[in-house]
Structure formats: C-alpha cells, structure tokens
UniProtKB/Swiss-Prot annotation:
Function in brief: Promotes apoptosis by activating caspases in the cytochrome c/Apaf-1/caspase-9 pathway. Acts by opposing the inhibitory activity of inhibitor of apoptosis proteins (IAP). Inhibits the activity of BIRC6/BRUCE by inhibiting its binding to caspases.
Source organism (scientific name): Pongo abelii (Sumatran orangutan)
Residue numbers spanned by region Disordered: 217-239
Protein name: Diablo IAP-binding mitochondrial protein
Domain of life of the native organism: Eukaryota
KW Cytoplasm (keyword) present: yes
Length: 239
C-alpha cells in the first residue's frame, strides 16, 4: 500500500511537470501572439497617421529670387511702358497720316481749281470770274484748315516719338533684351511712314505753286494785252 501511494505520488508529480512543460511554451506563444496582434494595429496606425501628417504639412515651393529682384521688376515695368508708348505712337501716327492725306487732297483740289480758272481767263465776264474766285477762296480756306489740323497732330506725334525714344532708352538701361529693339524698330517704321506722306504733300504743294505761277503769268499776260488794246484804241481815237 505504501508502495502504491509512493508510485501514485511520483506519477502525479511527473504528470504535473509534463503539463507544466507543455503549458509554458503555449502560454509564451499566446502572449507573443497577443502582443504581436496588439502591436500590429498600432504600427499600422502610426504609419498611416504619419503619412497623413506628411500630406497635411504644406510643402513650401522653392522661391525664385531672380523673378522677385528689383532689376526684374524694373524690366517688367519698363516693358509695360514701352508697350504703352508704342500704342500711343501708333495711334498718333495713324491720325497724322490721315490728316496729312486730307491736307494733300485739299491742296490738289485747290490746284485743280487754279488750273481751271487759268484756262478760262479771258473767256469769263466779271460775274463768272467772281463766282469762280469764291469757289477758290473756299477751297483755300479748307486747305488752310487741314494744314493747321495736321500741324497740330504733328506736334502730338513728335511728343509720342520722344516718349517712345525715352522708353526705349530706359528699357536698354534696365537690361531688357527685346523691348528696346522692338521700340526702336517701331519708331523707325512710323518715321518712314510719315515721311512718305510728307513727300506726297510736298509734291502737291509744288503742283499748287506751279498752278499759281501759271495763273499769275496768264493773268499778267491778259492784263498786258488788254492794256495794249486800250492804248491802241486810244491812239486810234486821237488820230
């Protein structure tokens, strides 16, 4: 009986130790698995949260010091000035060319009237001659008005040219590349255009002067002939 109790006691002890050996790894694995399951969501949360944080933080753009420099701002401003002065110059050039053209037409109209009057000298009575002269006087007044108008516009145009030249020089001094070249080319172009219409008006004025000289010559000749006829008649009467 004592031997049986001793054997049972040893068996129970061995069984307990065996179960303890089996339970320790299981518990350890369970704890490790639980810790792993516990830490995994936190790791994901931290990772996702960190990513969201990075997305939420604004990334500052790299500044461009050259585009914000005083020199660049001056070049930009002077480019606007050259554009504005070029527009002003274009408008005044157009107005001046139109005014000179209208003046040239008025000169040719007066020239035509002078020539017609010259061709009719000696063929008109005093009333008809007065009527023709009234038309000539009106045409001359129209020509004078057109001339004054274009001279006034020419003063404005010269001011526009001066402004454009100063703007081009300012653009050159600030280091702008294209603005001064464009402005100077534009100035040269409008000067050529104005000079062309000036040549046409001077040609018309020359024609008018020739017509006036011819009219004066014809009138002087006619008056001389009339005087000679009068003297001849007087001489014949004396005889």
């Amino acid at each position: 009986m004592a031997v049986l109790k001793s054997w049972l006691s040893r068996s129970v002890t061995l069984l307990f130790r065996y179960r303890q050996c089996l339970c320790v790894p299981v518990v350890a694995n369970f704890k490790k698995r639980c810790f792993s399951e516990l830490i995994r969501p936190w790791h994901k949360t931290v990772t996702v949260g960190f990513g969201v944080t990075l997305c939420a933080v604004p990334i500052a753009q790299k500044s461009e010091p050259h585009s914000l420099s005083s020199e660049a701002l001056m070049r930009r401003a002077v480019s606007l000035v050259t554009d504005s002065t070029s527009t002003f110059l274009s408008q005044t050039t157009y107005a001046l060319i139109e005014a000179i053209t209208e003046y040239t037409k008025a000169v040719y109209t007066l020239t035509s009237l002078y020539r017609q009057y010259t061709s009719l000298l000696g063929k008109m009575n005093s009333q008809e001659e007065d009527e023709v002269w009234q038309v000539i006087i009106g045409a001359r007044a129209e020509m004078t008005s057109k001339h004054q108008e274009y001279l006034k516009l020419e003063t404005t145009w010269m001011t526009a040219v001066g402004l454009s030249e100063m703007a081009a020089e300012a653009a050159y001094q600030t280091g702008a590349d294209q603005a001064p070249i464009t402005a100077r080319n534009h100035i040269q172009l409008v000067k050529l255009q104005v000079e062309e219409v000036h040549q046409l008006s001077r040609k018309a004025e020359t024609k008018l002067a020739e017509a006036q000289i011819e009219e004066l010559r014809q009138k002087t000749q006619e008056e001389g002939e009339e005087r000679a006829e009068s003297e001849q008649e007087a001489y014949l009467r004396e005889d």
